[in-house]
A protein has these predicted regions:
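Active-site beta-strand termini and strand-to-loop segments that position acidic
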Residues: 51-54
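A cross-family kinase active-site recognition segment
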Residues: 131-181
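A conserved alpha-helical element in kinase catalytic cores
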Residues: 63-110, 130, 135-139
């Protein structure tokens, strides 16, 4: 398991279950010594923020929900490390805390642990915002998907064996909920 530091952020109490922009600014300043503007981003599980540092660099700040699985965080960290060593396309990189770790733990206002990670920012457009989606774009997506797949052939982690609801090969669960779609 990746080293996780218990930093000075343990003394900061988060105001609620969600993370405000002000709290995200404080978290990134205390744990990564980075100051700048913060923009809230959508996310499935983690609270995500784009950090635009005063030094001109952009980052992705990821703050877990309470009661996160440490194996899940370790999986994500090791996955990015593996891809950065084995993939020819640009992949976000794990950034180190001021303590030299790839993640740290903070406490929320109810005393629950949350994992914090900072990644390099990768510029690009969301697929949903691209218009028109043409043959060239589809070919590029397919090529990059193949590159990622090849790069992951030798990646092993116990957490990669779990079932994911949105995995198309595990989609039969929706059959009993089709009226909700």
């Amino acid at each position: 398991i990746t080293k996780i530091s218990i930093s000075v952020m343990n003394q900061m109490v988060l105001e609620n279950s969600k993370i405000s922009i002000k709290e995200a600014q404080k978290i990134v300043a205390v744990n990564y010594d980075i100051k700048g503007s913060v923009e809230k981003l959508d996310g499935e599980i983690d609270f995500n923020f784009k950090i635009q540092s005063t030094k001109g660099k952009n980052y992705l700040l990821k703050i877990s929900r309470p009661n996160f699985e440490s194996d899940y965080i370790d999986f994500q960290i090791k996955l990015l490390d593996h891809l950065n060593k084995n993939c020819e396309i640009e992949i976000a990189e794990n950034k180190l805390t001021i303590d030299g770790n790839k993640s740290c733990i903070i406490k929320d206002n109810q005393g629950r642990d949350r994992s914090v990670r900072l990644l390099s920012w990768t510029e690009g457009r969301l697929w949903s915002s691209v218009n028109p989606i043409n043959q060239s774009l589809r070919k590029g997506l397919g090529s990059n998907t193949a590159i990622l797949t090849r790069s992951l052939i030798n990646f092993k982690h116990s957490f990669s064996k779990r079932e994911i609801e949105w995995d198309i090969s595990n989609s039969l669960w929706v059959e009993h909920h089709i009226d909700k779609f």
